[in-house]
Amino acid sequence: MKPRAVALVAGGGFAGALCRHGIAVVLPGTFPWGTLVVNVAGAFLLGAIVYGTERLRSVPESTRLVVATGFLSSFTTYSTFAGETIALAPRLAALNVVGNYALGFVAVLVAREVIRWRS
């Protein structure tokens, strides 16, 4: 692994973790809105990067390392989603699971269409 790549991933990861924490603080409550927001936003952004790279060939490797591998890996979180879901009442837990997966999937589809529209 090259030192520059490590630095790019680490910098992105640091920023992603801080942003995730900030959103969780801004959106407190009994339902894990912060985790839902970051997971859906992260799915959209990753979808845009994946489809942008595929269709536009305009996402440089350094951007992919910082944003996708670094930032989005720390910004989105499966482990927090799983832990928060277990702590919810059964109906809210089911809503959280459906919301995270369905909205995340829709976010990727929307990102794909935005990239197609812009290309």
UniProtKB/Swiss-Prot annotation:
Protein localization: Cell membrane
Annotated GO molecular function terms are: fluoride channel activity
Q: What InterPro entries does this protein's entry cite?
A: FluC (IPR003691)
- One cellular component term from this protein's GO annotations in UniProt: plasma membrane
Q: Which reaction does it catalyse?
A: fluoride(in) = fluoride(out)
Record keywords, A-Z: Cell membrane, Ion channel, Ion transport, Membrane, Transmembrane, Transmembrane helix, Transport
* GO BP: cellular detoxification of fluoride
Q: Name the membrane topology term.
A: Multi-pass membrane protein
Transmembrane spans: 6-26, 31-51, 66-86, 91-111
The record's principal subcellular location, in a coarse class, is membrane
List, alphabetically, the Pfam families matched: CRCB
Described by its record, this protein's role is as follows: Fluoride-specific ion channel. Important for reducing fluoride concentration in the cell, thus reducing its toxicity.
**Which family does the record claim for this protein?**
Belongs to the fluoride channel Fluc/FEX (TC 1.A.43) family.
Protein name as catalogued: Fluoride-specific ion channel FluC 1
Q: Lineage in the entry?
A: Archaea, Methanobacteriati, Methanobacteriota, Stenosarchaea group, Halobacteria
